[in-house]
Amino acid sequence: MSMMTVWALRRNVRRKNHSMLVRYISGSASMKPKEQCIEKILVANRGEIACRIMRTAKRLGIQTVAVYSDADRDSLHVKSADEAVRIGPPSARLSYLSGVTIMEAAARTGAQAIHPGYGFLSESSDFAQLCEDSGLTFIGPPASAIRDMGDKSASKRIMGAAGVPLVPGYHGHEQDIDHMKSEAEKIGYPIIIKPTHGGGGKGMRIVQSGKDFADSFLGAQREAAASFGVNTILLEKYITRPRHIEVQIFGDKHGNVLHLYERDCSVQRRHQKIIEEAPAPNISEKFRANLGQAAVSAARAVGYYNAGTVEFIVDTESDQFYFMEMNTRLQVEHPVTEMIVGQDLVEWQIRVANGEPLPLSQSEVPMSGHAFEARIYAENVPKGFLPATGVLNHYRPVAVSPSVRVETGVEQGDTVSMHYDPMIAKLVVWGGNRGEALVKLKDCLSNFQVAGVPTNINFLQKLASHKEFAVGNVETHFIEHHKSDLFADESNPAATEVAYKAVKHSAALVAACISTIEHSTWNESNHGKVPSIWYSNPPFRVHHEAKQTIELEWNNECEGTGSNLISLGVRYQPDGSYLIEEGNDSPSLELRVTRAGKCDFRVEAAGLSMNVSLAAYLKDGYKHIHIWHGSEHHQFKQKVGIEFSEDEEGVQHRTSSETSSHPPGTIVAPMAGLVVKVLVENEAKVDQGQPILVLEAMKMEHVVKAPSSGSIQDLKVKAGQQVSDGSALFRIKG
């Protein structure tokens, strides 16, 4: 396919003349006849799901094509594909959501089928229809089913007509704000506002009273439009103690439909799942059978084939389940189902797309053991789980095995940008029963190493270790109801003292380990090598007892309350051990360190030996040091006091973030993002709690409110402007 042809296609597409593109693709010699099997798949997605689809395709001997934006040029999914095509700038609207551009990529590479993954175009009936009209195989359900189920209002009307129980609500076409507010009052507060299209919790708002309705409704519309291109909304009665249980269904083109049991996705933050499991705990076999049958009936009602998920909300007080929505795609959490049924669902998708019947009947679908999935995100947990951006300076996932999977789309050195979802990886584990699987989950979380961006790993460890989670007492408000256990409480002196004691122990381990590294580093530098990142202190006298002081600033990663300086005396003893002195009449700690790798150590203290790992990188004039041992992970930093070689510093992440102090009353950005809307003017009088501006990052909106009453001063931003985390937005003058 010549570049002249591509340009001609683009010209016609821009004139909204899609017919030429359809005719071109349909007539291409590379398009497969219907009786042939798929030989080349274009994956219209990015990140971990693109890598996961390609893995199965390659196992089946199918060639793969990746698409990428400028931000993803060097991403893992691009490297994993046989071919890759650039589709536009970083903005998802101009790249991964551009169906016509993706169709051009398919024509250019001779792909016979398109797998949409999840998100982006996966639930676009228009895109599925374009594939069908163009002679391409869309690896997913028919466009008609996506259309019926993609509109949540329409899907609820269909399910209601089919006798599936529904939560009371409004699913009509009238979207006038006054009409919607009137409907909300009829339903009765609290209510939940949901976009009629899309998923992932985007655009969802819980409204407790009428006074909050207008702001929530308009915010939901904006977020829905930004994420899905459609801003229509539905309203539902908000069930106060619900469980979120979904059923994996599968159909083929021969009329067969079955379910592969259920998943519990109740543990959520910001209306997004973070730990999923299969099967759901604490339900009866009768409940499971009824739920599965309801899901199959829902799929049959719309002539469904390929992979889909029917989501139900379960009232924990009555044990009644209600249809919530149907996701017409492969779900993020599909691996937990794969683990308990022993099947590759992407392979099923491809075979169904080829016209093959389902490989099993309902009675043949096995269920073995229990599986968990934990989603590892780049996010600031102390800041309300706000998404974070930055470089993965250190990335060491756990080792995979038949019972442990790591689904990821990143490598060490990659950047987590503001343009896409901040997920780093999915950790999936299997055990013979729920207890065994939970033990494995906690162990793997303890050994999953990420440094360079804040993550939710520590929070996931707390969730997995909670006594109520251990017995399966889960519901969607689990985090809110147990926040005193899950979040650090600075007002509890005993808990604070225990936490700080653990930090000081980690600091002692860091001091001993970096002293060990510095011995070898000094020897290397004496032979003409430039000091590495680890060298920051004078060398010890090797054959005599010597002492140095190491100062570490502790970044309080739990509470996000700043740094604490820890000063340690490190005494090198003739027998090769270290004596760590913390001062303040604290007892000394004797440590013996054996180097087990570049940054891995075996440390013995008081007859107890343990594995310790360190990672370090340069950022903002500091050496940042992370330590992992047992279930502990802490981070420290040291002011860099020597010059490093250009090569040494060149590979480290450097930012231009603001480090100077701000005038009193200055409000700074809680995250990097795009200013969507500025709601007031400079010098305007505002009340405490009044919304001032709206930020968007990773398609999620965050409203910045006035912390106190006063007048707005030094308003520095406008709509459409990008801001960095911690940059000044405005000032409140009382």
From Swiss-Prot:
Q: Tell me which residues bind Mn(2+) 2.
A: 325, 327
Where in or outside the cell is it found?
A: Mitochondrion matrix
Requisite cofactors: biotin; Mn(2+)
This protein's pathway reads: Amino-acid degradation; L-leucine degradation; (S)-3-hydroxy-3-methylglutaryl-CoA from 3-isovaleryl-CoA: step 2/3
- ATP-grasp domain residues are 156-354
Positions bearing N6-biotinyllysine: 699
In this chain, Mn(2+) 1 is annotated as bound at 311, 325
UniProt domain Biotinyl-binding: residue ranges: 657-733
| Active site per database record | 329
Q: Which residues bind ATP?
A: 152, 236, 271
The GO biological-process annotations, alphabetized, read as:
L-leucine catabolic process
Give the sites modified to Phosphoserine: 645
Residue span(s) of domain Biotin carboxylation: 37-484
Enzyme class, first EC level, given as a word: ligase
Kindly state which reaction or reactions the protein catalyses: 3-methylbut-2-enoyl-CoA + hydrogencarbonate + ATP = 3-methyl-(2E)-glutaconyl-CoA + ADP + phosphate + H(+)
Q: What is its main location?
A: mitochondrion
Q: Which UniProt keywords apply?
A: ATP-binding, Biotin, Ligase, Manganese, Metal-binding, Mitochondrion, Nucleotide-binding, Phosphoprotein, Transit peptide
Q: Which domain of life is it from?
A: Eukaryota
- What tissues express this gene product? In roots, cotyledons, leaves, flowers, ovaries, siliques and embryos.
GO MF annotations for this entry? Answer: ATP binding; cobalt ion binding; methylcrotonoyl-CoA carboxylase activity
What does the record's miscellaneous section state?
Temporal and spatial accumulation of the alpha and beta subunits during development at approximately equal molar ratios.
Q: How does it assemble?
A: Probably a heterodimer composed of biotin-containing alpha subunits and beta subunits.
Tell me, what does this protein do in biology? Biotin-attachment subunit of the 3-methylcrotonyl-CoA carboxylase, an enzyme that catalyzes the conversion of 3-methylcrotonyl-CoA to 3-methylglutaconyl-CoA, a critical step for leucine and isovaleric acid catabolism.
Q: Which PANTHER family match?
A: CARBOXYLASE:PYRUVATE/ACETYL-COA/PROPIONYL-COA CARBOXYLASE (PTHR18866), METHYLCROTONOYL-COA CARBOXYLASE SUBUNIT ALPHA, MITOCHONDRIAL-RELATED (PTHR18866:SF33)
Name under which the protein is recorded: Methylcrotonoyl-CoA carboxylase subunit alpha, mitochondrial
Q: Which organism is it from?
A: Arabidopsis thaliana (Mouse-ear cress)
Taxonomic lineage from the root: Eukaryota, Viridiplantae, Streptophyta, Embryophyta, Tracheophyta
Q: What would be the name of the gene that encodes this protein? A: MCCA
